[in-house]
Amino acid sequence: MGYHGGTMRVLGRRIYWRWYGEVLLEGGVTLRMTGDVAKWLRPGDRVRLRTEFKKPVLGFDEYALEAAFPLWPPFAKTLEHVRESPFGGEAYRYRLKVREATYEGDYEAIAELEQFHYASEKEVVALWVCTQCQKTIPANAKPLCDCGGEARLKEIRGSTPASRFLVLELAERLPFEPRILGYLRLDPPIPRMHRRTPEGVERDIRERIFPRDWFHPTYEGGADWQKALDRVNTAAARIARVVVHPDYRSEGFGALLVRVALEWAKERGAPEARRE
């Protein structure tokens, strides 16, 4: 990629969805990226931009961005995974891509996998919002709003505004095989709900640090969440969840996702990409 832009200052950000946001740089440049990346860039941050294009708005595939860590394009790793035969040798070879969730369809696939994780029709795994009337609709699958408007995925059950996701994608698949085989959720190292100290047991630690609506119920938004994200600067990351499609749970994909997540956290400083 050719060099144009150099070191620039972040002026602002707009977060629309987990899969779509914009970052405004000095000089009138707007970068389109996922909301899960854009929300970590604070006004005043210095970033390094590389692009071949001289235009005010740069799309997903038109630039690279770095700060303390590479920020864009999203993390991705292509690999092969061999299933061995019980009699020795290779039984099957998967060609896979492990990457950060980037597109709306990725998050819809995550919501679908959550249904396998909870395995109960009584458990609602996602929140959707109508783009016409702005009504929030709890549902396991994409619902139809009463007003006739299109519902789009807003949030995944149990996740927080700080959560970031890796998806395990079949790079080569047969028509009957799912595109996304599993996912991993990476969070800041939020303390456990209760902890034991010399003085006794401290309860509900997370709610003392983060807004209550991050956990009860699944996050729906609030005035304080971006301020909380702006203060995050961790020395570690926490693997909060690993879910694999039930038809593929004997293939070692869960362990594979964990190994790649460790690379992601090391190479990109995920989730917030600020620690030194």
Spell out what each predicted region is.
Residues 244, 249-266:
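Conserved acetyl-CoA-binding loop-helix of GNAT-fold acetyltransferases
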Residues 61-104, 129:
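Conserved N-terminal entry element of GNAT/NAT acetyltransferase domains
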Residues 140-150:
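Cysteine-rich micro-motifs
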Residues 1-17:
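Structural detector for short beta-strands of small beta-barrel domains
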Residues 125-127, 156-159, 163-165, 173-245:
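Conserved acyl-donor/pantetheine-binding loop and adjacent beta-alpha core of acyl/acetyltransferases
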Residues 3, 34-50:
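Short nucleic-acid-contacting surface segments enriched for D/E, G, S/T with interspersed K/R
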